Amino acid sequence: MSKIFVNPSAIRAGLADLEMAEETVDLINRNIEDNQAHLQGEPIEVDSLPEDMSRLHLDDGKLPDLGRMSKAGEGRHQEDFQMDEGEDPSLLFQSYLDNVGVQIVRQMRSGERFLKIWSQTVEEIISYVTVNFPNPSGRSSEDKSTQTTSQEPKKETTSTPSQRKSQSLKSRTMAQTASGPPSLEWSATNEEDDLSVEAEIAHQIAESFSKKYKFPSRSSGIFLYNFEQLKMNLDDIVKEAKNVPGVTRLAHDGSKLPLRCVLGWVALANSKKFQLLVEANKLNKIMQDDLNRYASC
C-alpha cells in the first residue's frame, strides 16, 4: 500500500492562506456593519447637528429667495477657502493639513493608489498656499510672517514669465515640504536615473526577496509578507522603490536600505491583497520610523 507524503511547506502555505482568508472575511463583515449603521435606528441628537442647521427656518406663505441664497452660498464658500485677517494663518494651515491627512487615509482605505492620491493632494495644497500665502516680489524673507495682516495698498506690477515660474516653484516646494511627513526628504536625488543606484537597490532587494517581514493587520494582529508575494519583476520593484523618499540617497551612499519600508510602499501601491490585510495608519508610522532610523545611521 503506497504512502502519501505531504510537504510541510505546503501545509504552512495553506495555513497562511487560511489566516488571510479569515482576516478578509472579518474585514468584509466590519465593512457591512459600518455601511448598515444608519439602519440601526439610533436617534439623532439635536446638539450634534451642524452649526448651520440652527439658522434654518420655515415660512408658511413665502418662498425662499433663491438668488439671495446662491449669493450667500458663494460668499460662504469664499470665506471658507480664504483666511480672515484676524486669524492666525499658521493655525488655519495646520487645521487644513489635518483635514488633508484624514482624507488621504480614507482614500487609501477605499483602495486607491497612494501615488495617485499624493499627486492630487500636492496640487490641492499648492492651490491653498498660492491663495492664502501670496509671495509678492520685492518683499524680504523677514516680513513674510506679517504679509497676511498687512494693510498696505497693493502695487500693480507686470511680472515677467521667469518671475512667475520662480514663484510657482517656490509654492510647490513649500507645499511639498509642509504637507509631507516631517522627516521625509524631498530631494532631487530621488529623481536621478543612476544605474549604480538602481543596481544597489536591486542587489539589496534580491538578497532579501524571500525574507518575510512583519506588518500590522486590520485584525489587531500581524501578518508576514515578502517581495516574492508581489508577483512583480525585480525591475518594476526597483522602479517603484526609487519613489520612496530617501531611498535613492541611501543607495547612492551604499548604505543599508529600509527594506520593510520599501516592501510596504510597493505593496500598498500594487497589491490589492496587501491593501485588504494591512492597517494603513500603523503601516505609515512603521514606514516613517524605519526611514528615520536608517537615515540617522
Curated annotation (Swiss-Prot):
Keyword Coiled coil set for record: no
Impact after mutating L56I: In strain: RC-HL
Region entry Disordered, spans: 57-82, 132-189
Biased amino acid composition, Basic and acidic residues: 71-80
Classification via Gene3D superfamilies: 6.10.140.1560, Phosphoprotein, C-terminal domain (1.20.120.820)
Post-translational modifications: Phosphorylated by host PKC and by an unknown kinase.
Residue spans of biased composition, Polar residues class: 158-180
One GO CC term, this protein: host cell nucleus
SUPFAM superfamilies: Phosphoprotein M1, C-terminal domain
Extent of motif Nuclear localization signal: 211-214
Phosphoserine: residues carrying this PTM: S162, S210, S271
Effect of K165A: In strain: RC-HL
GO biological process: microtubule-dependent intracellular transport of viral material towards nucleus; symbiont entry into host cell; symbiont-mediated suppression of host cytoplasmic pattern recognition receptor signaling pathway via inhibition of TBK1 activity; symbiont-mediated suppression of host JAK-STAT cascade via inhibition of STAT1 activity; symbiont-mediated suppression of host JAK-STAT cascade via inhibition of STAT2 activity; symbiont-mediated suppression of host toll-like receptor signaling pathway; symbiont-mediated suppression of host type I interferon-mediated signaling pathway; viral transcription
UniProt entry keywords in alphabetical sequence: Chaperone, Cytoplasmic inwards viral transport, Host cytoplasm, Host nucleus, Host-virus interaction, Inhibition of host innate immune response by virus, Inhibition of host interferon signaling pathway by virus, Inhibition of host STAT1 by virus, Inhibition of host STAT2 by virus, Inhibition of host TBK1 by virus, Inhibition of host TLR pathway by virus, Interferon antiviral system evasion, Microtubular inwards viral transport, Phosphoprotein, Viral immunoevasion, Viral RNA replication, Virion, Virus entry into host cell
A GO term for molecular function: RNA-directed RNA polymerase activity
Motif Nuclear export signal: chain residues: 49-58
CDD domains per UniProt: RABV_P-protein-C_like
Renumbered residue ranges of the record's region DYNLL1 and DYNLL2 binding: 138-172
Taxonomy, superkingdom: Viruses
One Pfam family of this chain: PP_M1
Function: Non catalytic polymerase cofactor and regulatory protein that plays a role in viral transcription and replication. Stabilizes the RNA polymerase L to the N-RNA template and binds the soluble protein N, preventing it from encapsidating non-genomic RNA. Also inhibits host IFN-alpha and IFN-beta signaling by binding and retaining phosphorylated STAT1 in the cytoplasm or by inhibiting the DNA binding of STAT1 in the nucleus. Might be involved, through interaction with host dynein, in intracellular microtubule-dependent virus transport of incoming virus from the synapse toward the cell body.
Homology family: Belongs to the lyssavirus protein P family.
Protein's name according to its UniProt entry: Phosphoprotein
Record gene name: P
